[in-house]
Every structure is written in C-alpha cells, then in structure tokens.
A protein has these predicted regions:
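Helical "lid/coupling" subdomains associated with nucleotide-phosphate turnover
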Residues: 23-33, 37
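Generic structural signal for well-ordered secondary structure
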Residues: 7, 14, 29-33, 45, ...
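Active-site neighborhood for divalent-cation/phosphate handling
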Residues: 49, 53-159
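Glycine-rich, flexible loop segments associated with nucleotide phosphate handling
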Residues: 30, 111-114, 162-167
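Short glycine-rich, Thr/Ser-proximal phosphate-binding strand/loop in the N-terminal lobe
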Residues: 1-26, 64-69
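Gly/Thr-rich phosphate-binding beta-strand-loop-beta motif of the actin/hexokinase/Hsp70
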Residues: 1-15, 48-53, 157-175
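Solvent-exposed loop and beta-edge segments used for protein-protein assembly and interaction
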Residues: 44-46, 107, 173
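Phosphate/pyrophosphate-binding loops at sites that engage ATP/ADP/AMP, CoA/4′-phosphopantetheine
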Residues: 36-49, 133
C-alpha cells in the first residue's frame, strides 16, 4: 500500500476442537498449535513473524494522566508506579505495556497514557502456541484494539474514507 500502510494479503480460518480454548484460555496447547500450523500451510507464505492478541477479558486497561515530556525511562517508572494502584496482581506476575495517547483533556502539560496488563501465563500460552507452530510472535495486542486498528486500515482505503457512510465492525465471537 502506498504511504507505508498495511494490507491483508492472505488469511486462513481453522476449526479448533471444542476443548482447545475455554473461556479465552488455551486448554489444549498442541491442538491450538496444530490448527495454527494447518492455517499457516494454507497461507503459503515464507514469513514466520506473527502478531497475536489477547481477549479483552484477559487484559486490564486503564487510562492515566502523567506529566507531559517525560523521557522513556521516566515514563516507565511512572507507569509502573501507577499500575500498582490498578492491577490486582504483583507486577512480576504480569506483562505490562503502555501507550501515550496524546495530550490530556486538561491541557495542562499532561499526557493521557493507556496502560495494559495481563497475567504472564496468558501471554506465554499464546506465544507458546505460536512457537510450537514454528512461528515467532513480534506483537501482542488486545483483540478489540487489533480489530479497531484493522478497521482504521480498511476505512482509510474507502472512497472519501467512508465519510457520510454507515460502517460497522462486528465481532461475532465463537463458541
């Protein structure tokens, strides 16, 4: 895509045994890895790098306000300090990430920052399934944020960016 954007060139959908994933948790790692392998073979691609996503139910997110202009290391310290207030687990039990969203609504030299935390085993299970399928995870996202990012990519390709159109993003889920 011109302008350095992304596009979906191929995709695959594979059925999982009923017991493979329960309540968003991988219960049968080998069954999930095998489904990933089958799908990957159908894609006929040489890349081994993938982006993964966690269900929103497995992630705690919170928007916080921090002073604007912090260096990366200062920002990390502040985020960890704030995260202790909102995450009901010890920080060594979670994977923690953050994204500066932009200036806070107060506009008083503050930034709005989104923090996201998930239990390490939730992240590690998904990474293990990808690795068991011979792939390397480069990105871990939240399903709803990944869907929004995909939607924005599609919207940007619509005539007039979809202005004056009704556009829906539907997540039908699975059971």
């Amino acid at each position: 895509v011109s302008g350095g954007g992304y596009r979906v060139e191929r995709y695959a959908v594979e059925a999982l045994p009923r017991d493979a994933v329960t309540d968003g948790n991988i219960a049968n790692l080998e069954a999930v890895a095998e489904a990933i392998r089958r799908g990957w073979r159908r894609l006929n691609t040489s890349t081994r790098f993938v982006a993964l996503a966690l269900p929103a139910s497995a992630v705690i997110t919170k928007k916080i306000i921090l002073p604007a202009g912090l260096r990366d290391q200062e920002l990390e310290v502040q985020v960890e300090s704030e995260a202790n207030q909102y995450i009901p687990f010890a920080l060594d039990e979670v994977n923690l990430d953050f994204q500066v969203i932009g200036p806070a609504a107060s506009g008083a030299d503050e930034d709005e920052v989104l923090i996201a935390a998930s239990r390490k085993e939730k992240v590690e299970d998904r990474v293990a399934a990808a690795e068991a399928a011979g792939l390397k995870a480069l990105v871990m996202d939240v399903e709803s944020y990944a869907a929004l990012s995909a939607f924005e990519l599609v919207q940007a390709q619509l005539p007039g960016h979809g202005e004056d159109k009704i556009i829906a993003l539907v997540d039908a889920g699975a059971n």
